[in-house]
């Protein structure tokens, strides 16, 4: 027996055991499969429609997690703000007594704002004077610091210049006195030259 024959026998047994409505659907699927000549439809026959319904109801365990978008949070905040504004408007419209109290509060707020504006203008003039004083103090302090910096820089330059190695060779941490080394080389060269002159 081939695999197709085994599948066909299995399908026939399922069709016989299934209720009458399902048997008719399976028969229609078989007819369309024979007309189309595709084997994929046979796999569709094996599925039980009741299983499809239960699978749709169950959430997939391997479902990907949705990435969090912060735009959603912004939308929620905007909605909350709109709700608060709506509630405030509703409170104002609830009773005329409350509206009158709110109007008095508005007048007081306007007076406070005007007083702040008047005070703010005077403060700005004082701030300008303070800024000028601060600038002068800063300039004076920088002048004092500048004199001290020059003295410190001179000491550092002397130290740095004493440690400079003019040749391109590494000393691996050894301190080399180039004057002494030059004298030794001159003596060696001088001795060699003197020996060379005597031979001639």
UniProtKB/Swiss-Prot annotation:
Keywords for the protein's UniProt record, in alphabetical order:
Chaperone, Nucleus
A Pfam family per the record: CHZ
Where is this chain compositionally biased, Polar residues type? 25-41, 159-168
| Biased composition regions of type Basic and acidic residues, renumbered to the chain | 1-13, 42-61, 78-101, 174-190
A cellular component term from Gene Ontology for this protein is: nucleus
Residues annotated as region Disordered? 1-200
**Source taxon at top rank:** Eukaryota
Give a yes or no for keyword Nucleotidyltransferase in this entry: no
Name where it's found. Answer: Nucleus
Q: Which InterPro entries match?
A: Histone_chaperone_domain_CHZ (IPR019098)
| Residue spans of biased composition, Acidic residues class | 102-139, 146-158, 191-200
The record's similarity note reads: Belongs to the CHZ1 family.
Assembly, per entry: Forms a heterotrimer with H2A.Z-H2B, stabilizing the association of the histone dimer. Also, with a lower affinity, forms a heterotrimer with H2A-H2B.
Known role: Forms a chaperone-bound H2A.Z-H2B complex that acts as a source for SWR1 complex-dependent H2A to H2A.Z histone replacement in chromatin.
What's this protein's name?
A: Histone H2A.Z-specific chaperone CHZ1
The organism's taxonomy opens as: Eukaryota, Fungi, Dikarya, Ascomycota, Saccharomycotina
């Amino acid at each position: 027996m081939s695999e197709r024959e085994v599948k066909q026998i299995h399908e026939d047994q399922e069709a016989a055991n299934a209720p009458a409505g399902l048997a008719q659907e399976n028969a229609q699927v078989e007819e369309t499969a024979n007309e189309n000549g595709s084997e994929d439809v046979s796999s569709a026959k094996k599925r039980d429609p009741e299983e499809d319904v239960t699978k749709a109801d169950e959430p997939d365990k391997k479902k990907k997690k949705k990435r969090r978008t912060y735009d959603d949070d912004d939308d929620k905040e905007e909605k909350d703000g709109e709700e608060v504004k709506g509630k405030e408007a509703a409170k104002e419209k609830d009773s005329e007594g409350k509206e009158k109290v709110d109007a008095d509060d508005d007048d007081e707020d306007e007076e406070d704002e005007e007083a702040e504006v008047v005070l703010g203008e005077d403060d700005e003039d004082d701030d300008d004077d303070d800024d000028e004083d601060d600038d002068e103090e800063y300039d004076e302090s920088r002048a004092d610091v500048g004199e001290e910096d020059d003295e410190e820089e001179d000491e550092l330059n002397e130290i740095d210049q004493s440690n400079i190695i003019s040749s391109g060779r590494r000393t691996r941490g050894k301190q080399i006195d180039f004057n002494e080394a030059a004298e030794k080389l001159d003596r060696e060269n001088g001795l060699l030259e003197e020996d060379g002159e005597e031979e001639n």
